[in-house]
Amino acid sequence: MQKFYRLSVNIVKILTLLLAVFLFIGSFLTTCYAENMETQQVLLRFDNPLWNLLELAGYGLLFACCLSLSGKAGVKFRRGLLVFTLGLILLLGGMLIVFGRTVPAADALSVYNAAAEWILGNKDIIHPTFSYLSYYPQQIGLMAFLELLLRLWNLTGLSVPAWHFVKLVYVCLLCVAVLFQYRSLRYLWPDDWEPVSCCYLILVCCNLPMILYSSFVYGEIPSFAMLSVGLFLLLKLLADCIPAHSVETTSPDDTRVVGTSHALSAVTVFTALGSILFLTLSVMLRKNSLILIIAVLLVLFFEALRPGRSGRACIGLMAMAVCLTITSVGVLPLVQKCYEKKAGNTLSSGVTAMSYFAMGMQESSRGYGWYNGFNIDTYDAAGMNSDAANAISRAAINERIAYFREHPGYAVNFYLHKHLSQWADGTYASRQATLATYGGRSDFLKEVYEGSLASAYIEWGNAWQNVLYLGMLLFCIATVRKRRPGNGSANAAANDDFRFRNLCLYT
């Protein structure tokens, strides 16, 4: 079992290292961005490596100054930096609400309107053919969350649009995410968490796209917050509640015995349940979070196999994995059933996953593999029949595969540009996501979105992303190069593996 554990962990390390190499090289040598906010076409440019090195050196100097101050002032500096970071998020997030005037648009507007109409008593929101939710039933969880916020806002009796209140809640949730990620660092770097936490807070302060996303009335920010809390509780569970390290105990005859502590207490159970709850909520708010759930399940699997785990702890971790799988897969259907029962109607199965896969192999006006409407057009053409939609999608996939085989150079170019457009955009499409407004946006922010400051914002995001990818790459290299210790250092090796897996999960 230990050999299988080592083999599995090493495979994950190598694959993560390869991913880090691709991400850093792509981001360091190129930048993807959008200039025209109407077409939102993704453009590609090659960067000046010397300029990028200068930006990395600037961040290095910033980190060095931060660590120097941390060494002199100690805990006061770290706490002050945390307060400053959270205050900065609240300040900038509030300014975006007042001066940015972003409004929901596209899918975000459809879900927002669905929640508002439901509150007004419109039961046609739940309908097998006429409803937006019959195309995208996975949005039912976000609709439930927005319904709660809108009902709270309606209690105030104010005439201000409710989406401004939603954005304020999102700013607070962003602070929650940062706070719990900050607290998670103590479990990831128990020996060096103070300097690491300072560097983390510096990165958060410089992460302008994340703050800009607080005005995006969609599922990203609340799901991100739930994930951060759930992962913190998971790390706490693994590190505190069911640790895998040797401890000395005293037997009845006063003989010192080396064993492993695996006490199953109420704290352990509630920590596990809390982690499952928040991770499940993240899926309810944004179905894409299932990707992170898969990563969590892999972590639980590896932790169950970790040397030093007792049979009881192993069973507990596997039971947690089973529970998390059930709740994550079942939460959206459960919410959907609740709404269907209240409405006395049903929703269709929705746009098929295979149509998304087919769309990812096609061109669009924005870029290779981006949204072009194929999924919803196919669902309509199939008469909202999932089997027929899948048949059309399979035919489209086979057609593209045949074309790629006939034109291998085009295939390489297609997937290279698709990869870069998704992973070499340091703004993370934050301007496009928060572009919509009904007027009142300040002149300064207009320049950021479509004017002279847009290029500066793009460059800022690119520099930040280079730092992130470089840090990930260096950590992966250091972890892979570390030699396997002898049997006497098995716990040290397991701790390194624990840190690596969970850092990959956070990344």
Residue ranges and their predicted role:
Residues M1-M95, C314-V322:
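Start-transfer (signal-anchor) and selected internal transmembrane alpha helices
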Residues F24, V42-A57, P161-Y170, K418-D496, ...:
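Membrane-interface anchor segments at the N-terminal boundary of transmembrane helices
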Residues L109-S134, G141, G367-G373:
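Extracytosolic helix-loop segments that constitute the early lumenal/periplasmic catalytic or substrate-binding loops
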Residues N113-A114, S131-S159:
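Short hydrophobic/aromatic helix or loop-helix immediately within or flanking a transmembrane segment
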Residues V166-L173, C199-L234, S282-L292, T507:
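Multi-pass, polyprenyl lipid-linked donor-dependent membrane glycosyltransferases
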Residues L168-P190, V229, L474-A478:
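Transmembrane-helix motifs of polytopic, lipid-linked glycan transferases
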Residues Q181-C206, G486-A493:
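Transmembrane-helix signature of polytopic, membrane-embedded enzymes
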Residues K337-G440:
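Membrane-proximal stem/loop segments at transmembrane-domain junctions that anchor or position
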